């Protein structure tokens, strides 16, 4: 699992924050504007009535007898009934889900306050490692901000974000289905109807990001997770680009080489159309066992992406071949999805003719694979290399300078859904106490290096290979980029292995399973 400037502390949605202030003011109203000559409580008859109107629209007299009063102990818990302060101690570490150079991902259980007992994924990042260079700082900035802004059925949910002196914590929904990558490793290749389901859900997630002015730029099997039902969830938003709308381009060189669009490699400026190229590369990977263009090293892979013809296996249906050719066009302007219709253009293709988009968005379409899970805490779909380890969050003994810590101001976040549950649980509905008023691969990741420190925390058919025929070559649409002279390096590196189809009966067995691709590239924190 990879993945606004405001005062640090608990974030309250504006409507809740104001309402809570009014509620608390009502609870502790002591009527300081009462006239000095008003009668004291001693002058009232025992068990008598208060005969003045209470400004409740003519509400009548209130009985002051003890039978109408509620006794409660004054304590921090009973007085401070708003959202709790989230800190590492609020979570019990259960398993290690992944590790990276900058931190770990744990499976955790919340043990205090709202969501007590619920399972989450906790991503822990070391501040000292992040602030070393602008690239990693920008990665963290983008992920944190986008996760707060974007809410969609096919995008991972951020529940909490908080920090200590030396670490950043992102509490995400736990996706017990694991990575789509592991499903591909298990199956080798997908049937077309299976690929169609996943591609359809992914296209809806990409379309939602594009509506928000966000380009994803790192679509690959490792960044696609499955929930407990088998539905898709996009994760890892570190390479996203924000505020990109129609007519706007960006020039940052980033992504994972095998899935990168030619215009990114050419540094000629790119827009949201790069995500549709990546969807085509992912579709090719699902249906054939490897991305469309791979080489012995990065330079050879780039050379193939820019110049080579697209080879399509003969077993693909006409609809699949046509969609691949339209998504993998080197001329970005003529690529399917590049027009004003964006995701709608892709979804209207005959390859998706059997998809009911409304039911898909509502997650009423049954996924082709449902994880076989024993409990909510099941980690069988994750690599046992990590899950076997003892979960330990190392002591937070590092200290950053005050200027370095300024970078992380406003990092704290609480999901609106949590605030809503707090509002429901701690509603300030008045009980009659007294007459007072009461008033939410070798994959090759390339990260962006440009960073501005200002405004940091802003806002079918079977895929059988029984008939081995020579793949058919289809000439790809040419453009100026194919004339580029790419120097091929003599550096040696292992080629991307091609998955072989699993010809045996499908077994819904739990992992562990050893990936055929280098482990150090499977977890990017």
UniProtKB/Swiss-Prot annotation:
Keyword annotations of the record: Acetylation, Apoptosis, ATP-binding, Cell cycle, Cytoplasm, Kinase, Membrane, Mitochondrion, Mitochondrion outer membrane, Nucleotide-binding, Phosphoprotein, Serine/threonine-protein kinase, Synapse, Synaptosome, Transferase, Translation regulation
Residue stretches of biased makeup (Acidic residues): 32-46
Span(s) of short sequence motif TOS motif: 28-32
Modified residues (N6-acetyllysine): 516
PROSITE patterns registered for this protein in UniProt: AGC_KINASE_CTER (PS51285), PROTEIN_KINASE_ATP (PS00107), PROTEIN_KINASE_DOM (PS50011), PROTEIN_KINASE_ST (PS00108)
Entry keyword annotation includes Transport: no
Post-translational modification: Phosphorylation at Thr-412 is regulated by mTORC1. The phosphorylation at this site is maintained by an agonist-dependent autophosphorylation mechanism. Activated by phosphorylation at Thr-252 by PDPK1. Dephosphorylation by PPP1CC at Thr-412 in mitochondrion.
GO terms under biological process: apoptotic process; behavioral fear response; cellular response to dexamethasone stimulus; cellular response to growth factor stimulus; cellular response to insulin stimulus; cellular response to nutrient; cellular response to type II interferon; G1/S transition of mitotic cell cycle
Disruption-associated phenotype: Impairment of body growth. Lethal in combination with Rps6kb2 deficiency.
Organism field: Mus musculus
Name of the protein in its database record: Ribosomal protein S6 kinase beta-1
Domain remark text: The autoinhibitory domain is believed to block phosphorylation within the AGC-kinase C-terminal domain and the activation loop. The TOS (TOR signaling) motif is essential for activation by mTORC1.
Main location (coarse class): cytoplasm
Localization (cell): Cytoplasm; Synapse, Synaptosome; Mitochondrion outer membrane; Mitochondrion
Protein kinase domain mapped to chain residues: 91-352
Reaction equation(s) it catalyzes: L-seryl-[protein] + ATP = O-phospho-L-seryl-[protein] + ADP + H(+); L-threonyl-[protein] + ATP = O-phospho-L-threonyl-[protein] + ADP + H(+)
UniProt keyword Transmembrane helix, yes or no: no
Upper classification of the organism: Eukaryota, Metazoa, Chordata, Craniata, Vertebrata
Enzyme Commission designation: 2.7.11.1
Residue positions, PTM Phosphothreonine: 252, 412, 444
Matches recorded under InterPro entries: AGC-kinase_C (IPR000961), Kinase-like_dom_sf (IPR011009), Pkinase_C (IPR017892), Prot_kinase_dom (IPR000719), Protein_kinase_ATP_BS (IPR017441), Ribosomal_S6_kinase (IPR016238), Ser/Thr_kinase_AS (IPR008271)
């Amino acid at each position: 699992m990879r993945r606004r400037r405001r005062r640090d502390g608990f974030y309250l949605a504006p409507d809740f924050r104001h309402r809570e202030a009014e509620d608390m003011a009502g609870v502790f109203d002591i009527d300081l504007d009462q006239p000095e000559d008003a009668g004291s409580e001693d002058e009232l008859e025992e068990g008598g009535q208060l005969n003045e109107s209470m400004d409740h629209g003519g509400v009548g007299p209130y009985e002051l007898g003890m039978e109408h009063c509620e006794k409660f102990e004054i304590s921090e818990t009973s007085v401070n009934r708003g959202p709790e302060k989230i800190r590492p101690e609020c979570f019990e570490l259960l398993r290690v889900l992944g590790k990276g150079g900058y931190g770990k991902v744990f499976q955790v259980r919340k043990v205090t306050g709202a969501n007590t007992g619920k399972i989450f994924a906790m991503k822990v990042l070391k501040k000292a490692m992040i602030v070393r260079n602008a690239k990693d700082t920008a990665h963290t900035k983008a992920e944190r901000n986008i996760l707060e802004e974007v809410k969609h059925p096919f995008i991972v949910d951020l529940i909490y974000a908080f920090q200590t002196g030396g670490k950043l914590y992102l509490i995400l929904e736990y996706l017990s289905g694991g990575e789509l990558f592991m499903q591909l490793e298990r199956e080798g290749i997908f049937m077309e109807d299976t690929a169609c389901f996943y591609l359809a859900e992914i296209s809806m997630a990409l379309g939602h990001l594009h509506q928000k002015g966000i380009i994803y730029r790192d679509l690959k099997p490792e960044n696609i997770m499955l929930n407990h039902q088998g539905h898709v969830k996009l994760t890892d938003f570190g390479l996203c680009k924000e505020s990109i709308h129609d007519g706007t381009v960006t020039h940052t060189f980033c992504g994972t080489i095998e899935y990168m669009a030619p215009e990114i490699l050419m540094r000629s400026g790119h827009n949201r159309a790069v995500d549709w190229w990546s969807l085509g590369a992912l579709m090719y990977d699902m249906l054939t066992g490897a991305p469309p263009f791979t080489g012995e090293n990065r330079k050879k892979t780039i050379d193939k992406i820019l110049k080579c013809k697209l080879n399509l296996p003969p077993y693909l249906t006409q609809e699949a071949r046509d969609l691949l050719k339209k998504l993998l066009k080197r001329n970005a302007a003529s690529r399917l999805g590049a027009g004003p219709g964006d995701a709608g253009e892709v979804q209207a293709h005959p390859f998706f003719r059997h998809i009911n988009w409304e039911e898909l968005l509502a997650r009423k379409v049954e996924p082709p694979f449902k994880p076989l899970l024993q409990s909510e805490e099941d980690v069988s779909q994750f690599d046992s290399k990590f899950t076997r380890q003892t979960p330990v969050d190392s002591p937070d003994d590092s200290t950053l300078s005050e200027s370095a810590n300024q970078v992380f101001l406003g990092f704290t976040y609480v999901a609106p859904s949590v605030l809503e549950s707090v509002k429901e649980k701690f509603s300030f509905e008045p009980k009659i106490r007294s007459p007072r008023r009461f008033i939410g691969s070798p994959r090759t990741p390339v990260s962006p290096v440009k960073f501005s420190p200002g405004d940091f925390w802003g806002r079918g058919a079977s895929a059988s290979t029984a008939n081995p025929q020579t793949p058919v070559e289809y000439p790809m649409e040419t453009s100026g980029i194919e004339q580029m002279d790419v120097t091929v390096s003599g550096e040696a590196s292992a080629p991307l292995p091609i998955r072989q189809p699993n010809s045996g009966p499908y077994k819904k067995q739990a992992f562990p399973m050893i990936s055929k691709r280098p482990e150090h590239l499977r977890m990017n924190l």
